[in-house]
Amino acid sequence: SIKKKPESNDTAICVLDAGMNDSQREQLKNKVDEVAKAEWDIEVSNLKVMGKEWLKSQVSRAFLPKYFPKYEKYLWIDCDAWVNDWKCVDLYFKACEKGKLGITQTMGPGYKIMSKVKWLFGKLAIVKSQNFKHALSSNIDISKSRKLAFAPHINIGVFSLQKNSPCWEVWQKNLRQTLKNGKIFGSEGLAINLSVYVDEVDTEFLPLNCNWIASNLLPKYDSIQKTFVEPYLPNNKIGIMHLAAGIWKNNIDMRLDKNVKIDIYNLQDKKETKSLRSEE
């Protein structure tokens, strides 16, 4: 999806190898600028790893300048996300200027539930928001955990940072803490939420279409422009489509099977059967 955009000519594509096989590496060889083998940049117990080498990517993304040192700006895009509109990429690179973190909060028009709460009786309830739950299980100080309880969750699947941003160090500090007692998966996300909401790193929040998580809210399709758009007016074009958590049909994940398609509405409110993957 990046190479198809003419604006990408002066943009390097780099990949972290967190357990690819020889065939996968060979396929990528002539399509990207660099491939670097991910390491455990923070020591993690073998009991937590359990042979899942791909979990390195949860840690190594917080150390991107170490792996790819010759660049000044970094835009991380998860492998289950793709670029639909290059204007979004430009926004991310603009957002991270002056050391800021460019990132998107998981909130916007159409989101009906921001945090899970289990009501016991009367006014008494148990907070079960993703941030709060993960913070407690990672043994994060209760005062810090409470700051995260109802803060809009920040998805770490797409973000931008300059090479010399102070955010790297803050993020790495929090990642060491979350890895100490919590699970590896999701640790980097919790760490960035701590960095933003507790340490208050300088952040440029970008619109939801810059990291559109389709499993949270399906897009619409503009049949005339042949592109995915937000489902509510003014129907902005989706910048980066993110298939986090998968798009499932008949127990098959669209990320793993190119043939999976689902029904979504177009701008005339008629159903169309589409794949949410990037066209090849």
Model-inferred region functions:
Residues S1-E279:
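Glycosyltransferase catalytic domains, chiefly GT-A lineage
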